[in-house]
Structure formats: C-alpha cells, structure tokens
C-alpha cells in the first residue's frame, strides 16, 4: 500500500497506477463471462490526438471498465489508421521542411514510403502515449495498424471477392478531383462553402441561320415579350468549361424553346455545333431556362450525358489547366447491358480532329482561362450579362482548393445491393442507433447511395491488387501476381505491372470489425476470438462518419461474415471550444488533452499552436488570442478531472462546448473526494467493524465487506441513497447517459456523502454511544468503498489510489479496484429505511434553512445562536427531540426553545419548514439598523446596474450589431445582477 499524502496531487500516482495495471495484465480479456467488445475508431497516424479523440475514448473506457467490473469478458480493440491522403500530405510537407532539397517526387515511391513508415512509428507512439495517459484500459497486445500484414491480407481478399462477384468494376466516371494533390477524394473530404460569385449569360448562335419567335409570359400567363431571336442565352457560373460543351438543354415543357429541340447551336470560340436537347432536370426559372451541358466537368451533366449518349469532352488536365491537346471520348453501349446504365457503358475515343481548343488558351490555369474566355466572348459580342450570384463552392478540406469534377478511369464498388441489405439490418433492429433519431440520417444516405470510387492516386496505402498487361492494357485482378499468372495462363513473356493507385482509406476501415479478429485466416480467427467477439457490443463514434464508416462497416461485415459488426451505435456530438467554434489548427483553438492533464506553459502552448500551420500568416493572430485566453498557460488538472468533465458534458445528440473552467471544477471534486477519504481514514484508524466478518464472494474471489447494520437514522438514510444511486448508475450506463451518470454520482458524492453524511456522522463518532460510533465508522468505510467502485469507470486513478487505503480497513484482501465487482443495488427494509430517510431529509431542510439565515446575517461560523420554534406538527416535535444533539452540533446552537402560538416572538430572522416556524433572535447578534442601511444602499446600486443592462438589451441596434458573444455576456450579467438583487431583498425582508 502506497503512502497516503495529505493533499491531492494526481501527478504523484496516475502514471504509476497505469503502469501497474498494464504490467499485471488487467486490460486483457478474461475469457470468462459474457463477451463485451468495443471497437476503437482508429485514429489517423497524422500527428496527435485532439479533444474529440479524448472525448470518445473516455466514454469507451468508462464502458469497458464498467463491464469488466460487472464480470463481462471485455475486449477493447484498439489500433491506428494509415490515413492515406492526410498522412501523405503531412510527410510530404515534412520532407520539404527538412531542408535537404528533397521532395516526395525526388525520393521516388519506395523512398517516400520509407519516410512514411518512419513517421508512422513516431506518430503511433505519441498516440498510444496519449491514450495511456488518459487511462485507456485497452489490450495493447492486440493493437492493430490498418497496414499490418493481417489487415492488408483482408483488404486484398475483400477486393478480389467483390471483383469476382461483379461488385467491383473499373470504369471512366466523374470523381472529386483535388488539383493540388492530383488525386480523387471522397465526398467526406469535400466541404461545400457558400461564396459570392458571378452568373454569366452567354449567347450561343443558332446554326444554319435558324431563328425563332421568343415569347415570354408573366405568372398569370399574360404575354409580356415577343421577339425574333437567332441565338439562345445560356447562364453559367463556369465559362472556362464552355470548350467541353456537348449540348445545350431546355425543359421539354418550356414553351419558349420546344420548337428548337433537335436543332443545333454553334459553340462560341470553337465553331463546333452542339444539339439542343430536352430534359426534365432543367429548372425553367433559372436564368434564361437554357443551360450548357458539359458531361466531363459537371456531375449533373455527366448523368445527362449518360442518358442522352453525349460525347465526353475533357478540357482540363489533372492540375486544372486547359489541355494543350483536346481529349474527347464518347459512349459505346454493349448490347447485353441495359442502356443508360453508366456502370456498364464502355468509353471509346473520338477523333481529336473533331474538337479543337484555341491555341491561345492551351495550358492556362482554369481561372486565367476563365478571364481570357470572357474577354474573347465580350470581343465577339457574345457576353450578354454578368450578375452577382451566391453559389456552393466545393473545396478540399485538406488543401482548400476548389475541387474539380474530373473524368478519369477509377475503381468503383456497386452499392445498390449492399445498401439495400445494410438498410434492412438497421430497420429490423439488428443494429440500434443511440440516440434513435440518427437512423433517419442513415436511412436518407442509404436511400440516396451512389457507386463508391475506391481508388486514389497516391503512394501511401494498400496497392490495388490488379495487374496490367503492358502490351494491350488489359488487366487482371488477383491476390498476387503469381495467382494472376497461374489463373490466366500468362507466361514470363507477358509483362505485368501492378496498378500504381491505392485504395481509399475507408476501404480498409470498413473491414475493421472483423479484420482485427483475424479474417480471412482461419488460424488467426481462432486465435483472436472471431466467433466470440463478433459482433462487438457498441461503436462510439461521431455523426459525421455515419455513412462513410458506420454504414460501410455494416454492409461489409454482413457481406463477408453474415453478421452485423456491432449491436449499438452510440453517436456523440462534436467537441467545440468554449465559444462553440469548431476546434481546428487554423483557428488556433485546438486543445491537446495532455496539456489539460499535465499542464503546459504559455510559451510552449503558443509554440505548439503556431508551429506547422498550413497558413503561417495566421501565427501572429493565433499567438495573440492564445496569450489572452491563457495568460498563465494551462495548469495541470489530472486525467480524472478531464475524464469527469467529458462525462458530465456528454449530452445526447448535441455538440459539446468545452470549457476549461469545468475541468477546474471537477478537479475540485476530486480534491473533495480525497479530503473526505482522509477524514474517514482518520476517524476509523482503530476500526474493527469488519470483524467478525460476514462474507460474500467477490468477483475476484476475495471477500466482500459485511453489509452494515445501521444504528442511526443517518446511516439508514445514506444506505438508502446509496442503493438508489447504484440503481441509477446501472440504468444510465445502459442508456449511454454519461452526463446523467456523472451528475448523479457527483450529487451523491459531494452533497450527500461529503457534505451531509460526513457531518451527520460526527455527533455519533464523538458521542458516548460506542455501538453507534462503531456502526457509523463501518458505514463510513462501507459507503466510501462502494462509492469509489461506482466512480471508478469515470475517474479510475483517484478511486484506485483511495480504494487501496480504504479496502484494508474493511478486511478486503484484493489488490486492485479495477477488478472488484461493480456495486449492485441493495434490497433494504422498506419501512424502517423509508422512515429514517424521511426524517433525515427533514433534518437537512432544517439545517439548510438555518444556515441560510446565518449566511444572510453574516454571522461568523464560530458564533453560537439561539433557536426559537413555533407551530409545527407532532412529528416536528418528535424530530426536534430526536435530532437535538445533531442540531446543536451542526448549527452551533446555544439552546432550542418552543414558543406557544400566542407568545409574541422577539425581533428575529425567520424561516418556515412546513408548518414549523424557525426564529433566530437578532438581539446581540447584529446591529439591525446598520445592516438595514447597508442593504438598502447595496440594493439601489444593484438596481442601477440592472437598469443599465436592461437598457442595452432593449436597444435593437446593440442586439443586432454587437458580436454575439458580447450580447450573451450582457444577458449573463443581467441574470447575475437579478440573482444578486433577489438575495439582497430576501436578506432585507428578514430584517
């Protein structure tokens, strides 16, 4: 047993305890009991963990510790994700910052991959160190990296099986293309940002001298315009893609243009003729009702191109510059495939001579090309108008660049059949969402699913298991080149080259529930408990990846194993800063969990927040804001204070505003628990209440302390409250209501145990009834030991440290709290305990009322007061007599006297408890006149402040124009002033 210090210092024991737990193997599955499994969403190996990780990992660890104490066979599967794009970007930047003149490209693929592996080792170690410091009780011996041999084999197996089943195909389609990274990216990595732009109207001349009578009507159907026109006006926000137009399009029921459907227009700047087509996707009210169709550079236009069999003309290269030579493609539909299904359509080259890009535009960046094209159109009299327009601009979340819809050969997964099955599993309850409203989000995404582009033009990641014949370009899919050659009888004369692309990160992540359990290797599956631990019990994750990860795990796990990946999906909110802003490096508001746990100096915090910025110009602004917010740096709070803060903030379905002040408050809670334990230990030093012991078997085979046989009302009350909070703890764990769990345990520990029972125990401990004193000592120890077990899943370090001091006093021989059984609600004698509980609740009301009077009158704590009683019921008289010793002790009373109803009371401060009137005579206690004058003056001052605040908040200009934070601050001030005024008036009324 370690030395018990007089003050709470988490740095003195947290790291030591974790090392002891891990060395003893306490984190490993026991192999007995009901399986309880949690999958850790693997953090990316791109740096360090942030508050979002700490938030989710704290909740997961609480669940794991709770179920471990409940006797379940717990497995927390942890690991890290290779995070293809993110990691490649970070390492590429670091290579350049090393100052050796090296770049990703100069290193070459193998050299760069070696650099990434070095980074992965460094980053992975940092992540594990952070998780350990937080208290994560995971089986580290099973930690998995998504590019370890076993998961990599699973990736290859899944790809090959899906390809052989026809679910994976390779084809030309539009993808999200980042022109800086020069790779396809997922929808998740695209942020649509509302930005101000322009809407240009361009004249497309009708071919062959065709004219038409243009007629427009108002909303009532009245003709408002009739004129002959020889061109169509097309509205666009992207004139630079005009060179790739292959049609213009109108709505089939738009009377203005029905006569022109099937005619052609001459494409400006190129002289190429394109057809006027009709499609119901056109909005007749947008612009002129005529839109350009550029299938190779717009997602909607691509689908139109498929439906209408339009050529695909690519005019931008992979860097978003105008191609020097045009690259045009067209459609050829195999006879045995459904027409119009773009997944089954082959693309053929179209002779380049049919499509010409003006030479002076070749090679221009897309925005330079836009300027030049607009200038050319204006010169030719074809630019009709340019008006401001708000549009949604797709930007890559890593580079900030505008993403291009880009036509390229990629690998895809057909999602319709998989999605139908994934939706069915959730609809019938095989997978449950908590909170349940998230099923609506899941349902919407699954009903609107598209084929999944899984290939990325990167070096870091799982190479696609496909080999190309260098002679004719045909490709073969297999688990290895040797398998491909054997299966297709390819001799050494055939030169094969593996696809240089890699699979997107989510492809391997979707296999996480079962690849970590050894799939597809039968031996590994048996060793890692595939049958025992799949499905897992719960997935704790954020709502932002319900589709991109959660849905794909459901679909893949069902397809490859015939099982669901997990029973419950607990969706958390996002962690934001105290002002509700998203935490990000560019905002400079990111908090490292370790800085809250162990503290950090101001200079180190500024350096951490300003180093490695994607936009270095923000460094000065971030440094200034950091120095203002944390003038003294961040003090150490310990892991437990951070964990309890997280639990208390974990409300269902809402984003979390993280306020460091809350962590300070819960550090005080830990300190309160520490001091209460010191009190109990000091007052039970010679306790022998555990002997003779009445044994009951504990989970770990050790004896449990005997159940108290209470001799006082206070003991019966605290035991009844302990039973209630124990039952509530189990209920809140089952409901994933960590906030309500933390609140219930906090209220019991701070208010009921520390503030009340410890105080109510003192009269018994110091009284002459030795049996009551012994019983009270045992109950103090028993309740404290049970409370430490209740709190352990949330705050494991301090509870373990304190428990090791308390347990021997109860005759407990076990060496660690984390393997002790979680408390179960006790069945108490209803009538006796209920009566005692009611009596103590009455006593608490009495004491609180009289303490408020003392506080209101500013009576020093050491000053004794008199108490007069008037009225009340017979039960009140009984309770006054019964609790006389406790009342004198707790309230420092000189005497208690009863007044008859007819007796006039002296000037007194008054409180009412039911029908009982409590009077504290003022004579000799305070200078009543002076106190009245002081309160009157203070009331006027506070009323003046309230008037000022009301004046500001009733001013519409202030409310509408001041920053939101300033307005909220003023509202908060008004609330504080109002509360203060009510208190002053109450005190004045007392006098």
From Swiss-Prot:
Instruction: Write out the coiled-coil annotation as residue ranges.
Output: 925-988
User: Which Pfam families has this protein been placed in?
Assistant: Anticodon_1 (PF08264), tRNA-synt_1 (PF00133), Val_tRNA-synt_C (PF10458)
Instruction: List where Low complexity composition bias occurs.
Output: 693-704
Query: Segment Disordered: which positions?
Result: 689-711
**Where does the motif 'KMSKS' region lie?**
582-586
Report the GO molecular function annotations: aminoacyl-tRNA deacylase activity; ATP binding; valine-tRNA ligase activity
Report whether Signal shows up as a keyword of the record.
no
Q: Name one GO cellular component term.
A: cytosol
**Keywords of this entry:** Aminoacyl-tRNA synthetase, ATP-binding, Coiled coil, Cytoplasm, Ligase, Nucleotide-binding, Protein biosynthesis
Q: Which branch of life, at top level?
A: Bacteria
Domain characteristics, as noted in the entry: ValRS has two distinct active sites: one for aminoacylation and one for editing. The misactivated threonine is translocated from the active site to the editing site. The C-terminal coiled-coil domain is crucial for aminoacylation activity.
Per the entry, what this protein does is: Catalyzes the attachment of valine to tRNA(Val). As ValRS can inadvertently accommodate and process structurally similar amino acids such as threonine, to avoid such errors, it has a 'posttransfer' editing activity that hydrolyzes mischarged Thr-tRNA(Val) in a tRNA-dependent manner.
Family recorded in the similarity comment: Belongs to the class-I aminoacyl-tRNA synthetase family. ValS type 1 subfamily.
Q: What is this protein called?
A: Valine--tRNA ligase
